[in-house]
Amino acid sequence: SSLVCDTQTLPIRKLFSYGGYVEGWAYYTERISYEYAAQVLAEAEGSLGSSYPAALLCTLLAQQRDLQINLFCLLDLSLHYYGAEKSELLRSLESFGLSEEQSERVYDYLRTAPAVYLKYYVGYLEMNALKKRAELQWSDNFSLLRFHRFVLEAGPSDFENLTKRLKQTAAKTG
């Protein structure tokens, strides 16, 4: 639920599902949590005179998560759009180090939940594009706090309407 969902949102909006917004925001915040953790750990480790191994680990974990999400998106498209066979997908998963049992579980999940990972990644890309628009439109008035507040106060929505709302916000302040 958004910060203003109960008081300022048209009731009809509560009937719609905005998977791209919800999962995109979730993945966006997951990614910045890795960045914040790496920054804090680098500062702490720097004061100890070490070479930042924990900060590097955070960066590697973020990249591993990116690879996982991207791989699952590609496999989802391969299965549901291009019609790839189960054996092809299992072979791909196993080539990335998953066991046969893990590969079967991932395959079953992808088969029964089409486009689930696309909501995460495409929503994340849209969230980043929206942030870049906010940086350009708000210029010196941009801050992550302001952007995050804008997204949360807008509440679940499609990205076209979020972009329109962003332009209205920029017009009011600019």
List each model region and its residues.
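N-terminal maturation segment of proteins
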Residues: 1-174
